């Protein structure tokens, strides 16, 4: 593999905190919660009735109305975030570069809302009521496909699908595509609209989600003694990645370098984290080796931090295992305390927050952390953002099936 370095030049996000980077980042640094009562279906019969919904989003702002009808909501979010990231990068796509620009954008559960809607039409009226756009509107790889159709990019175009590690793997493999020489620019990340009735119902049946329905803003509380499960969130997080010399040649503004990527498997349990965080620890170690950085270099770690009793402790143990004594000197926070858990889009949003931490010198807080739970004894940047200039940031994403993904970003 040639020594092709990869940098981040564009960021785009749709989240429960806002429908662009400025509003979302403002919410993050000010410790605002985007969690509220579920509003787009009647959740009265569900154990969990709260989520981080995307609000005041109009897909027609990003795609023609006639085309928007052919896309599930997760595609709307992903297309919008992709177009924002392209604009933020100042990237002009033309016949001269289109074949060298690709998209690797995934989703954890994809078009589940569309599947529900079309199933209802079938049950009410039979097969003739099923939309001819049902399949292409719900399959996950149609998201990068729509980005290609809208922008004209002709490079590698596909999706990673690995539950809540989807975006970490998408971004990491997009970096590899550039390093391998298969592309000069990749649009990468994930999108999700998971707050649908069957999705919420499924997670409720697993007893995986918080039931703090009377206080939604305080429901997502990673590492806190009173944490009782995660809170679903919707949205998309997309990065524009470029080969360093290509970015320099076109005069691009460079946020930072994407220096390392790790991917491992627990081989332990369908949904529970591995004991003592063994799998995630190997993943972090792999990413650091790839970036050629020592544990002592990690200044900030955007954790997976879902607010589940088992998961938060396991990740704390994994961080200690991977970073050794330096774990206690590393600022660790979970922005899921504010956004909720965006599932397949989580790693994209959190990669953006990691990049912004390097770029702005502001470390995102973990809100709702009033009293750390047993064994949770790291510096979780509780409740208030912190001014701190760091050179290296790490971002974790772990998913059902025991799949892990870690990214390492470095200031240039």
Task: Name the predicted role of every residue range.
Residues 5-9, 36, 214-291, 300:
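Condensing-enzyme catalytic core mediating Claisen C-C bond formation in acyl metabolism
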Residues 78-89, 143, 170, 242-244, ...:
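Short, well-ordered amphipathic alpha-helical segments that serve as non-catalytic structural scaffolds
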Residues 268-277, 306-323, 342-349:
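Short glycine/threonine-rich loop-to-helix capping motif typified by GTGT followed
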Residues 124-131, 172, 176, 192-249, ...:
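Glycine-/small-residue-rich "gating" segment that lines the acyl/pantetheine channel
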